[in-house]
Amino acid sequence: MSTRSSFADEEQNKVPRIMTFRPSYEEFQNFSAYIEYIESRGAHLAGLAKIQPPAEWVPRKSGYDIDNINMTIPAPICQVVTGAHGVYQQINIQQRRQMTLRQFMEKANSELHQTPRHFDYDDLERKYWKNITYISPLYAADVKGSLSDEDLDVWNIGRLDTILNLVNTDYNIIIDGVNTAYLYFGMWKSSFAWHTEDMDLYSINYLHFGAPKTWYAIPPAYGRRLEKLANETFSENYQECNAYLRHKMTMISPKVLRQHNIPYNKITQEAGEIMITFPFGYHAGFNHGFNGAESTNFASKRWIEYGKRASICRCRSDMVKISMETFVRRFQPERYDNWLKGQDMGCHPEEPGKICAAAPPTLNEYEKQENLRAAKSEEESPQKRGCSLAGNGCERNAESAEDVDDKASVSSYSSCRQLQPVVKLRKLPTIASVPEPSSAPKRYDFNTEAVVRVKRLWNELPCPDRGANLLTNGVVKNTKRMRFQTKVLTLDDED
């Protein structure tokens, strides 16, 4: 027992610690360059870093008098927590009635929700975990907007100007809270559950005013350990969705993390301080009282490998999914073709030695060009016996074909948006019913040949244009129902 404890202590001593940086105003001028600098110092190894901005940086010159902040919270959420012994599930119930920021502050400072008396931050942390399931707090999360001045040019969270802007530039897509700013107004015990950022992106969080915020962070190198613990503890949730931690519902206490030898760090963010989370850095935390923060995501070239291999929740339609096509094409041109083919072999940055192919997009230019050439070749060759297609050609690789009978269906992640084609397919006899001349040198399995033909016809089904669906491939995992989009080939038996 002592040997195991000694080993755990030794490993904990090797865990990267959260670093705090105090840049000068000159060093603070270039956001992306400074992120590269703190990573050169190893800040990313802990998954979280704190930055204390220079005194010259004033994001809001008018201050934070609540009466001067014209802000309405459209749908605050009530956080209901269930569970015991350090393992909890947090359910966010959206309230129907909107609130002004002043009303929210008065609620936060009321006797029911005010911060309890405490000696220090450690004492307050103990009270948090002891009372986590009692008196559900309100949290004003994901509120569109910014508290920063529009003319703020340095570290303006609403426009950080990183490569994540390419999502808007190339796809003309704006994702609220990802490439725009979100505001968060908290009260005592309002929490953010264990999660990594959407697509394992970076994030920046600036605490504009109010009570502190406690953060927990797991170094990215140990992120899989947390996933394993969560998947075993909440196995039903995992069976429903193998990326269910992205639902941001799971709270696990530091005590339980220690029991399972999962290294973590803890830090308190004060008003006026910035927190940076790094790719695949799991983090969680809670607010000490009424406060206001501003946050968004950003990216760097180092993130691209994380993004290509990020887990994606497919059971919720509102989950953020970003095409990696523009990033691979621009910054990894030597790997682009292989990536499109699903042959971009490599490791997840936090799992060295575990080689696998990065998931390709479901639709891409390579597939289109290949199928265009195949379609052209078929047009030049005589039509094969028994098959004709009523409809347009298509640029799509085959997925799979099922039973060749009076009708067939094939699973696909992308449904066609055109008229359903009708395929006239002569029903082929089985090999047992086909007379075989004694001199025949070959045996033909006509059922197999029919499947091949249906696959070819499937390739020719009309599909959306490039850019309409560039999401990552992956298996939809659900024990209660399998969610697939299907296209139907209607087979007409002329025999």
Curated annotation (Swiss-Prot):
Indicate the principal place this protein occupies in or around the cell: nucleus
Which Gene Ontology BP annotations are present?
Answer: chromatin remodeling; circadian behavior; negative regulation of DNA-templated transcription; positive regulation of gene expression; regulation of gene expression
User: In which residues is Zn(2+) bound?
Assistant: C241, H247, C313, C315
Q: Domain of life of the organism in this record?
A: Eukaryota
Q: What is its EC number?
A: 1.14.11.66, 1.14.11.69
Where found? Answer: Nucleus
Q: Name one GO cellular component term.
A: nucleus
InterPro entries linked to this entry: JmjC_dom, JmjN
Q: Which residues bind Fe cation?
A: H195, E197, H283
Q: Which SMART domains match?
A: JmjC (SM00558), JmjN (SM00545)
What positions does the domain JmjN occupy? Answer: 18-60
Q: Which reaction does it catalyse?
A: N(6),N(6),N(6)-trimethyl-L-lysyl(9)-[histone H3] + 2 2-oxoglutarate + 2 O2 = N(6)-methyl-L-lysyl(9)-[histone H3] + 2 formaldehyde + 2 succinate + 2 CO2; N(6),N(6),N(6)-trimethyl-L-lysyl(36)-[histone H3] + 2 2-oxoglutarate + 2 O2 = N(6)-methyl-L-lysyl(36)-[histone H3] + 2 formaldehyde + 2 succinate + 2 CO2
Q: How is the cofactor bound?
A: Binds 1 Fe(2+) ion per subunit.
Where 2-oxoglutarate is bound, by residue? Y139, N205, K213, K248
Keywords in UniProt for this one? Answer: Chromatin regulator, Dioxygenase, Iron, Metal-binding, Nucleus, Oxidoreductase, Phosphoprotein, Transcription, Transcription regulation, Zinc
Residues annotated as domain JmjC: 149-315
Molecular functions per Gene Ontology: histone H3K36 demethylase activity; histone H3K36me2/H3K36me3 demethylase activity; histone H3K56me2/H3K56me3 demethylase activity; histone H3K9 demethylase activity; histone H3K9me2/H3K9me3 demethylase activity; metal ion binding
CC cofactor: Fe(2+)
One Pfam assignment: JmjC
Mark the residues carrying the PTM Phosphoserine.
S409
Kindly give the PANTHER family that the UniProt entry links to this protein.
LYSINE-SPECIFIC DEMETHYLASE, LYSINE-SPECIFIC DEMETHYLASE 4A-RELATED
What exactly does this protein do?
A: Probable histone demethylase that specifically demethylates 'Lys-9' and 'Lys-36' residues of histone H3, thereby playing a central role in histone code. Demethylation of Lys residue generates formaldehyde and succinate.
Family membership noted in the UniProt record: Belongs to the JHDM3 histone demethylase family.
Its protein name is Probable lysine-specific demethylase 4A
Q: Tell me the organism.
A: Drosophila melanogaster
- Taxonomic classification: Eukaryota, Metazoa, Ecdysozoa, Arthropoda, Hexapoda
Q: Gene encoding this chain?
A: Kdm4A
